[in-house]
Amino acid sequence: MGRSITTRELYDEIEAGSVPMILDVRNQDEFAAWQVEGPRPVPTRNLPIWLAVEAVDDLVKEIPADSVVICAHGNGSDLLLQMLSDEGLSVRNLEGGTSAWAELLVPKEIPDLPDGFVAWQVQRPSKACLSYVVGVPGHEAIVVDPARFTDCYLDLASSHDMRITHVIDTHVHADHITGGPALAAEVGAAYHVPIEDTGRAPTPFANDPLPDGATIALGNAAVRIMSIKMPGHTPGSTCINLPGSFLLTGDTVFVRGVGRPDLTGKAEELATELYHTVHDRLAPLDPGTMVLPAHWSFANEIAPDGLVRTELAQIFDSALLSEADMTRFIEEILTSLPSAPDTYDTIRLVNSGRQAASADEIEFLEIGKNQCAASTTT
């Protein structure tokens, strides 16, 4: 009666609202650090495995049929599944557990683009991270803010006969390990990350930083991508302007809120930069510009079409971004900052090429959703 479910199948069921319950049998501290979440809320219960195996009789009465049992790697949850099945309850085991969920990438096609131009928002539910593939079928593509699991980007490019020519990190990320240098090396593409973030010391990867206003041609120059420097979250934060009034904003602004300016240890200085970015660089743009950020914080930031996006005008409706007084703007940001995770300094060092990390260390460093927003409303 027990059976397994893949990470993508679970995501699709969460999106459809058809998961009765998730029973997470990891330790309480692991559960507190992060849970399986998707585009819709799903009832979730935490009961460590050693308690769950002693409570099978009760669980058979309390857990709905077809619920999903999860653990770190899928072994303990499979044991519990068999015990519940023996008692007549049909549940499912998440293949690979939360370790596999951490690697799930879900591409969502972005509609309403100019003719001959395609793009996808690639969602990583475990981190609430967003990356992008943008290109012209039969020609070239760029990848922006890639996760370290690169097969999804390669598959999207290959399925549309596109060659990845540029890989861009909008800034040095603090919440996850980038796949940028590895992907660029694998496909022979140029890699771009702001030198203001990496520092000017030599890096172990080739880097061709994009200056403000740089353009990248795709499809025999039929489509041009432009970089726009927007410091604030980091000194070198860059947005990517796509044809048709689409703006990949990295961590500069989100659907709700702005990027926190304290992760490089220069909170007040970068909060000032962020004020000028908001009022001098973002405000003059077309209010109908579609903002496509690098993260989300809550499921209600996901639009009905499954994309994390909103118009620039809606972002400026928030009290923070509409605040014209620089002193109050900075004060509101600085007083809204939660403590940054201890791992963020290490992740920044790894992403800037100044420190190496093993696969096990990377998995540990990436535990938990991103905490990159300075101001976010639920």
Residue ranges and their predicted role:
Residues 1-21, 28-67, 73-133, 137-140, ...:
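Rhodanese-like catalytic fold shared by cysteine-dependent sulfurtransferases
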Residues 1-4, 82-87, 107-109, 276-378:
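Accessory terminal helices/loops
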Residues 7-10, 119-122, 131-135, 215-247, ...:
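Core dinuclear metal-dependent hydrolase active-site scaffold
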Residues 27, 111-160, 240-249, 256:
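Conserved beta-strand hairpin/beta-sheet module of binuclear metal-dependent hydrolase folds
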Residues 29, 73-76, 150-151, 172-178, ...:
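Active-site environment of divalent metal-dependent phosphoester hydrolases
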Residues 71, 143-144, 163-173, 192-195, ...:
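Active-site neighborhood of phospho(di)ester-bond hydrolases with catalytic His/Asp-centered motifs
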Residues 128, 141, 149-226:
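Active-site HxH/HxHxD metal-binding segment of metal-dependent hydrolases
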Residues 134, 145, 171, 183, ...:
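Divalent metal-coordination and catalytic microenvironments
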